[in-house]
Design a protein with these regions (language model features):
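Compositionally biased, disordered extreme N-termini, encompassing classical targeting presequences
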Residues: 1-3, 104-105
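Short, surface-exposed ligand-recognition loops at beta-strand->loop->(often short) alpha-helix junctions
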Residues: 9-21
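Short, charged/polar surface micro-motifs in flexible loops or helix N-caps
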Residues: 14, 44-45, 55-60
């Protein structure tokens, strides 16, 4: 089964993390079987990376996505974003470490 990573790098406007986070969504917005992380730069507290991991068939994953809801979510976050860096869906090609104790490809 293929694992995918949705990842975005955002530079937030100063002091807007709480508002951005509220617009980003809740645990209930995460697809079943997925896990999401939000991390903050140690050198720039306004730079955050949000990423989520999900296993499955990409066509099936896309079929469960609500494009209108995602567009509304993006619009709600936009006022708090100064800039966006990397932003996309990536295929996990290696998993290394703690979960399995082994390297898999």
């Amino acid at each position: 089964m293929t694992t995918y990573c949705a990842l975005t790098v955002r530079k937030l406007k100063p002091g807007t993390y709480d508002e951005w986070r509220k617009a980003w969504g809740t645990e209930e917005d995460i697809p079943e079987g997925a896990e999401a992380y939000i991390v903050r730069s140690l050198t720039d507290p306004n730079e955050i990376i949000a990423f989520g991991l999900i296993e499955g068939d990409m066509d099936e994953i896309k079929a469960t996505m609500d494009e209108d809801k995602e567009r509304t979510r993006q619009e709600a976050m936009a006022p708090y974003i100064e800039s966006t860096g990397a932003d996309g869906i990536y295929e996990v090609i290696e998993r290394i470490g703690a979960r399995t104790g082994a390297t898999t490809t």
